[in-house]
Amino acid sequence: MVALVAPQAFAIWPELRRLWRLLRIVLHIFYGLLLATVIGAFWRPYRPLVQRATSHWLRCLLDILAVRMEVNGVPQQGTAFLVSNHVSWLDIPLIGVQRSVHFLSKAEVRDWPLIGLLARAVGTLFIRRGSGESQSKSVEIAQHLKLGRTILVFPEGTTTDGRSVKRFFSQLFAAPTLADVPIQPLALRYLDSNGQLDPALAFVGDDEFHLHLWQMLRRDQVVVRLSWGEPMAANGDRDQLARQAHGAVLAMLGS
């Protein structure tokens, strides 16, 4: 009888652990909303206090998700325009724990339950894809850069499975030129237990957030390699800068 029960107990354990992690995430989101309210993040999202609280909250989130990071290189000191390949919704917290940064996100995120509130609390800039507002958004980003706020963008405009990097849209590369701040490329690579690329961790196509998260919660560990490239001077036209940054990201993923 014992021999029959024991395997079932072992089979249940991963599901219990997954449910426990999910509960912790829900509680952590509510904690984040409470923290954002207490420190006034919804009204003044760009204060240093909010940035420190954001880094703390993101680090705790990665701990809940059992994320282990391998970091190569160092982030640019001071203000920078960060550009990265885009694989998953997890990209943002991974980069956010490395340095103080504000994000450019698709407009739909603003309306996500709870997550949208948190995004607004940390000063996220939203853009509607295909709306033709990239030019005006470049000017807005440049204004933030001039105020000393580092901005992260994903120039592919979508996510991939990590096997390749799509062409970088160049419109937003006008922002660092207008603000005269360096561009720093970075590369994200999600790995399996053998250190090889793991496309299963990508959030692509018609993937739904809650289903993707549910699958991720079953993993013992999520391993991500984040590589910081050499900063680039924002000289030249935006198409040239986009190609140069794209090449730098490809080179880091191939290393």
Question: Model-derived features: where do they sit?
Answer:
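A membrane-cytosol interface segment of integral membrane proteins
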Residues: T124-L145, T150
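A transmembrane-helix-recognition feature enriched in membrane-embedded lipid enzymes
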Residues: A3-E70, L117-A121, R219
